């Protein structure tokens, strides 16, 4: 649905094509893959100690959210946690990259971008 504001009208055809087509079970499965990527990625790319600690900690959180049952949290809480995790992944990725741990920063930033895409494409309704 396109907003009625005159400012948004030029991009309405672009925004109108985005659909929220991922179900919550598929969201959880893809979130699990993202968490596993956070656990394995820094080791494969040779990240430093700070990158390893950050990625393993955030990967464990992401896997925990993916494996939580469908009634473990309200949907809005899960969505809010996912958005908060995106912000933390982006901030930690930027911090690691600026401190010299480029491999760790790239892993966190890529998983953060993928998580943001996942959140934006998910239908936030119980099946």
Model-inferred region functions:
Residues 2-15, 33-37, 56-69:
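Hydrophobic, membrane-facing alpha-helical anchors
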Residues 49-61, 105-111:
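Structural signature of hydrophobic alpha-helical transmembrane segments
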Residues 15-25, 46-49, 53, 73-77, ...:
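Juxtamembrane loop-transmembrane helix junctions in multi-pass integral membrane proteins
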């Amino acid at each position: 649905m396109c907003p009625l504001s005159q400012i948004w009208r030029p991009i309405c055809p672009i925004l109108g094509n985005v659909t929220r087509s991922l179900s919550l079970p598929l969201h959880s499965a893809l979130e699990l893959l993202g968490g596993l990527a956070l656990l394995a990625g820094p080791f494969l790319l040779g990240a430093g100690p700070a990158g390893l600690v950050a990625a393993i900690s955030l990967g464990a959180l992401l896997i925990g959210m993916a494996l939580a049952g469908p009634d473990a949290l309200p949907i809005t809480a899960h969505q809010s946690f996912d958005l908060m995790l995106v912000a933390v992944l982006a901030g930690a990725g930027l911090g690691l990259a600026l401190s010299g741990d480029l491999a760790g920063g790239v892993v966190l930033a890529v998983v953060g971008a993928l998580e943001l895409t996942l959140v934006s494409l998910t239908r936030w309704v119980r099946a």
